[in-house]
Amino acid sequence: MGLEPSWYLLLCLAVSGAAGTDPPTAPTTAERQRQPTDIILDCFLVTEDRHRGAFASSGDRERALLVLKQVPVLDDGSLEGITDFQGSTETKQDSPVIFEASVDLVQIPQAEALLHADCSGKAVTCEISKYFLQARQEATFEKAHWFISNMQVSRGGPSVSMVMKTLRDAEVGAVRHPTLNLPLSAQGTVKTQVEFQVTSETQTLNHLLGSSVSLHCSFSMAPGLDLTGVEWRLQHKGSGQLVYSWKTGQGQAKRKGATLEPEELLRAGNASLTLPNLTLKDEGNYICQISTSLYQAQQIMPLNILAPPKIQLHLANKDPLPSLVCSIAGYYPLDVGVTWIREELGGIPAQVSGASFSSLRQSTMGTYSISSTVMADPGPTGATYTCQVAHVSLEEPLTTSMRVLPNPEQRGTLGVIFASIIFLSALLLFLGLHRQQASSSRSTRPMRHSG
């Protein structure tokens, strides 16, 4: 969010102060009133022709400001003291182009997310580019210009696309912008009016295989515009397909079970799509495209399908050393992490190296399976081996353990060897003592003298 430093600081301090207070009873959303507030965003103006709804990586871009004028925002106590955008009567060579956009004709449902993004530790990506009508229906259209702004709030925030039409209320002989060649207002802004917006609440969705998902997409349009069509398309790995379409009151599902509520579509501008019983074929980028009698805009939502792994640990063989096999089955996507840990009784757990893996297997559903094998060293008293599996579908790694004991035959052999060592040691000790006693008796025997 591109507030001037003083405004940004004031807003964040106000939010912090509101959060730090402890009122007797906090007002509910229904009790809170909406207060008209200017939302100011740092943007880039893209000066080359581009597709609707796409962001430029780099190239011909220049700095810009987007000022959404008097947007109704729920007042949580943090808006007190926030001043409206004043603009500047001086236009410098390196000053950013300022788009002043009225939102009187449409609703901005994600206004709070845009306003408080900076204070929430998030960022807003904003790009503005020229918008070209599909067909010019009136001669007066030739005297206007259109722009489309695409805004995304980071870390799972909403995404908004708005079509803005320039207003013709600039004074005769007004200063014109050097790049756009458009007349500027007395405050040095390009005055526009938002006539159409399309919003999605979440940029990326992760859902489990077999579950259901609702892909959010909503819109708001100015009076006089008619809704002509809604299309949901899926793009994945270079191919695209139509999932659902709605035109002039008729809906058609190309994907089995896909539904869109026509009453909500017409009453509240809710074009959300529901998909039941997700399969891996449902994974990809979903494009919600809304068409009106004059404008068209879209939102893109990536949907990731997840399948958590199931693990099982078993003993493969016992001779000469036991082998442990950890079977990991039914997971998606492909990447999985396997860690082996060994722990003796009363010892410190240690990671085991040298594990081998089987070839990767894929089921008819598209999920993956693999096995990991390690040679187990039970030691003299046994050891516990743990197979730990990490996957993107899991909040915490899965673990399974098995205690491995020494082979009974090996223990018997060791016992015989140990007993033999004790016997030989005792025998040697006995012989040594016997020899020592014999030597002592010879040295103490009386000597005979000849005479």
UniProtKB/Swiss-Prot annotation:
Q: In which tissues is it expressed?
A: Widely expressed.
Classify the source by domain of life. Eukaryota
User: Where do the record's glycosylation annotations fall on this chain?
Assistant: N270, N277
Its transmembrane ranges are 413-433
Q: Which Gene Ontology terms of cellular component type are present?
A: endoplasmic reticulum membrane; Golgi membrane; plasma membrane
Give this protein's Gene Ontology molecular function annotations: MHC class I protein complex binding
Q: Which GO terms describe its biological process?
A: negative regulation of antigen processing and presentation of peptide antigen via MHC class I; peptide antigen assembly with MHC class I protein complex
Cellular compartment(s): Cell membrane; Endoplasmic reticulum membrane; Microsome membrane; Golgi apparatus membrane
Span of domain Ig-like C1-type? 302-399
Which cysteines are disulphide-bonded?
C217-C288, C326-C387
The question of whether Aminoacyl-tRNA synthetase is a record keyword is answered with: no
- Domain Ig-like V-type, first and last residues per copy: 196-301
Give membrane topology per the record.
Answer: Single-pass type I membrane protein
Lumenal side residue ranges read 21-412
Topology, Cytoplasmic side: 434-451
Task: Identify the PANTHER family for this entry.
Answer: TAPASIN
Complexes and interactors:
Interacts with peptide-free HLA-A*02-B2M complexes or those loaded with low affinity peptides, likely facilitating peptide exchange onto higher affinity peptides. Interacts with MR1 in a ligand-independent way; this interaction may stabilize MR1 pool and facilitate ligand loading and dissociation.
* Functional note: Component of the antigen processing and presentation pathway, which binds to MHC class I coupled with beta2-microglobulin/B2M. Association between TAPBPR and MHC class I occurs in the absence of a functional peptide-loading complex (PLC). Expression seems to slow down and down-regulate MHC class I surface expression.
Protein's name according to its UniProt entry: Tapasin-related protein
Gene label: Tapbpl
